[in-house]
Amino acid sequence: MQTAIQHFQDKLSFEMDPSDLFEALAKNENVIVIDARRNFAYEKEHIPGAINLPHREMNSQTTSGFDRSALYVAYCDGIGCNASTRGALNMTRLGFNVRELIGGIEWWKLDGYQTEGANHTAGLKIGCAC
C-alpha cells in the first residue's frame, strides 16, 4: 500500500493538468509555461503567455536569465509527443523546479482554454471534470 501511495504522490509532484495550470495562471502564481516544441509549432499555436524554448535548445546559456524561484511547466503537442518530457528533464537537470503538462496543448484545448498564434482558438472554458 505504501508503495502505491508514494507512486501517486510522486506522479502529482511531476505533472500538472490543464485545469490546474489555468488556475495557477489565473491566480498569478509564479508559474512560467514553456512550449518545448520547435518554433514553427509555437508560431502556429501556443498556450497564452507561454515562452518558446525547444527542448533541443535548453542549456545553461538559453536559461541564464530565468527565475530560479518559479515553477516551470513544460508542454508539447500531447500524448504522441515527448518534447515536454525531454524539456522537463533538461530543465530539471539545469536545476529548475519543473512539471509536465498532462496531454499538452491538445488537452489544454479539449478543456476549453484559448490559444494564441496563427491558428489560435478562442476557447470555450468547458473546464475540468475531475
Q: PLM features: residue spans?
A:
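Flexible, polar/low-complexity N-terminal or interdomain linker segments that lie immediately upstream
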Residues: 1-33, 39-44, 117-130
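Terminal peptide-recognition signature
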Residues: 21, 35, 50, 91
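Short hydrophobic/charged patches on amphipathic alpha-helices used for structural packing
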Residues: 22, 62-63
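Short active-site oxyanion
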Residues: 28-33, 48-49, 71, 96-97
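Short loop/helix-cap segments at secondary-structure boundaries that form the rim of catalytic
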Residues: 42-48, 108
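Short, hinge-like loop/turn segments at secondary-structure boundaries
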Residues: 51, 68-69, 115-119
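Alpha-helical scaffolding within the catalytic cores
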Residues: 56-62
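Catalytic cysteine-centered active loop of the rhodanese-like fold, especially the PTP/DSP P-loop
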Residues: 64-109
